A protein has these predicted regions:
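Glycine- and aromatic-enriched mobile tails/lids
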Residues: 43-47, 64, 78-80, 87-92, ...
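Glycine-rich FAD pyrophosphate-binding loop
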Residues: 67-88, 97
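Glycine-rich active-site loop/strand segments that organize a redox cofactor
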Residues: 93-124
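Short beta-strand to alpha-helix junction loop
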Residues: 116-129, 162-180, 191, 253-261, ...
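An anion/pyrophosphate-binding glycine-rich loop and adjacent beta-alpha core
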Residues: 266, 272-384, 436, 445-451
Length: 567
């Protein structure tokens, strides 16, 4: 059920006494009303499973874990607000002949450019059909042909038709189904407009944690109630990071504004292991519209359906870069488009669908058709202006095959995690199935050990002392924009040693400014998101500098060749 928490009354002794609720109180004996700072109210809650995030990963885990104990879902916006809702193309699984597991495995390994964990790839591919069946049983409707078989699509990097989809709104269909199921599950509590600030570890008991600290444990999280303005100490036996991606570290992204890398940043600050952050996937084709954020995704399935990329001169340029043409993997297509734009000085390239059947386009891609039509583009007659946009993080919180991080009692699933499936580049439509497989496995694993876990009662409440209202919001908003500009200009599709060095120097200045501001300011969503984006940006830069080669999604003009193929 959805929770609406009312503020608790407080009673403090001192010069007179304080009495009252949320933001104001009566100072007895003085006869005046004194305004209390937001986030003054103290509250503790306990739950077996604390799930941070409400996309396919978080909601699927919650539904499975509810069989083992009480689940609390924390999401910083509405329950349905997630990256999942924006996924258009589909979800990949072997569902018909002549496709088979070995072909899907091979396609995934090729896309991952020598960096995939083959054991993980095999596990996900082989379990994928069962997880698809789970979604179907929950009520997700995938498109079928007239003969009743599934209407499987083919996307870049896939050698067979294996993409199940619901029109071009697959993510939205999955999210809607899961949201309804979660709302009707009595063992799940939902906390909307609640922002996870930090995960709780031995650090909050006074220990000094370093990377080599033995057996770091997670005991829950500090969570800000954004509506009632208080910080809740959530104590949990199991904590699950399902916070999605971090696309908003860049100026142009297909991600919604909530994608600020919160989970990755929290785990990094808690000394968890983060890996492969240099591998940021830029979707090759977002609709070119400088005044709109997030960028509207022009699904890869359109190219699978037959759409062709052209430069401003009308040339089908992709064959110059890869024999697969417009159906090459995303990293190749994104770099090709980026090069064409820079070579000709253009703001975008074209995606041409005009040679395709108009009725078929409208039927298979109603979302793209309607969205473009609203902007004066009839995709059955007009070329679509497209540009690459930050889309997906292949790196994240390192986990094992059950979704466990190196921090005990802490799991990570979905885009926030790094499982080894994607390697240096994600194969199209492999993200939703990864989330479904790992949320299932994480729920089974954590549920099986729940009885041996206890709450850590010694965790102190949030300390607001020494903080006051944010001095000037402009300090946050301008730094937010500056981080995005630094990352876009210097740490984008094509990188160099000099660009990365400059990005690091400038980001360090912003980091120091924001940390000082954070420590003396009351909690706000924006300052926390900026803090997380700075951490994530630093991780991308650091790992990009360490990679002295070009591989997958990481391309450096100073190190254009690939070195060893070791994982």
């Amino acid at each position: 059920m959805i929770q609406r928490i009312t503020p608790l009354p407080l009673l403090f002794k001192g010069r007179g006494w304080w009495q009252g609720g949320q933001n104001s109180t009566h100072l007895a004996g003085w006869g005046v009303i004194v305004s209390l700072p937001p986030y003054f109210t103290i509250m503790k809650l306990k739950t077996d499973f604390l799930v941070i995030g409400s996309g396919i990963a978080g909601l699927t885990f919650a539904l499975k874990a509810a069989k083992y104990g009480k689940v609390s879902i924390v999401t910083k916006a509405g329950l349905e607000d997630s990256n999942t809702k924006y996924a258009q193309g589909g979800i990949a699984a072997v569902f018909s002949q002549p496709d088979n597991f070995e072909k899907h495995i091979k396609d995934t390994l090729i896309a991952g450019d020598g960096f995939c964990n083959e054991e993980v790839v095999r596990m996900v591919v082989e379990e994928a059909p069962d997880r698809i069946k789970d979604l179907i049983e929950l009520g997700v409707s995938f498109d079928r042909k007239e003969d009743g078989s599934y209407d499987l699509a083919k996307e870049g990097g896939h050698t067979e038709f294996r993409i199940l989809h619901h029109k071009d709104k697959t993510g939205e269909a999955i999210e809607k189904t899961l949201v309804e199921k979660v709302k009707n599950e009595p063992n799940i509590d939902i906390y909307e407009q609640h922002f996870a600030i930090e995960i709780l570890t031995q650090h909050h008991l006074g220990d000094v944690l370093k990377k080599n600290y033995p057996d770091i444990k997670c005991f829950g999280a500090y969570v800000a109630d954004l509506v009632n303005q208080k910080v809740i100490t959530f104590l949990s036996k199991v904590t699950v990071i399902a916070t999605g991606g971090m696309g908003n570290v860049y100026m142009t992204t297909t991600n919604p504004e909530i994608a600020t890398g919160d989970g990755i940043a929290m785990v990094y600050r808690a000394k968890g292991t983060i890996e492969n952050m240099e591998f940021v996937q830029f979707h090759p084709t977002s609709l070119w519209d400088p005044n709109t954020r997030p960028s509207f995704l022009i699904t890869e399935a359109l190219r699978g359906y037959g759409a062709v990329l052209k430069n401003m001169a009308g040339e089908k340029f992709m064959k110059r870069y890869d024999s697969r043409g417009s159906l090459a993997p995303r990293d190749i297509v994104a770099r090709a488009i980026d090069n064409e734009m820079k070579m000709w000085g253009d703001d975008h390239v074209w995606l041409d669908c005009t040679h395709l059947n108009p009725d078929g386009l409208k039927d298979h891609f109603p979302n793209v058709y309607d969205h473009c039509l609203d902007r004066g583009i009839d995709i059955t007659k007009d070329l679509i202006p497209v540009v690459p946009a930050a889309h997906y993080s292949c790196g994240g919180i390192k986990v094992d095959m059950d979704g466990q991080s190196n921090i005990n009692r802490l799991y990570a699933i979905g885009e926030a995690s790094s499982t080894g499936l994607h390697g240096a580049n994600r194969l199209a439509s492999n993200s939703l199935i990864e989330a479904a497989v790992y949320s299932y496995r994480a729920a089974l694993h954590s549920g099986g050990r729940l009885a041996e876990l206890t709450f850590e009662e010694r965790i102190p409440d949030w300390d607001y002392k020494g903080t006051t209202h944010l001095e000037e919001m402009i300090l946050v908003t301008q730094n937010y924009k500056e981080v995005q500009m630094i990352m876009s200009n210097y740490v984008g599709i094509v990188r160099s040693d000099l660009r990365l060095q400059r990005a690091l120097i400038r980001l360090e200045i912003i980091y120091k400014e924001n940390e000082s501001l954070y420590k003396r300011s009351l909690i706000s969503k924006k300052i926390c998101e900026l803090r997380n984006l700075i951490n994530v940006g630093y991780l991308i830069i650091k790992m990009a500098r360490n990679r002295q080669e070009s591989r997958g999604l990481h391309y450096s003009i100073d190190h254009p060749k690939r070195t060893s193929s070791e994982f």
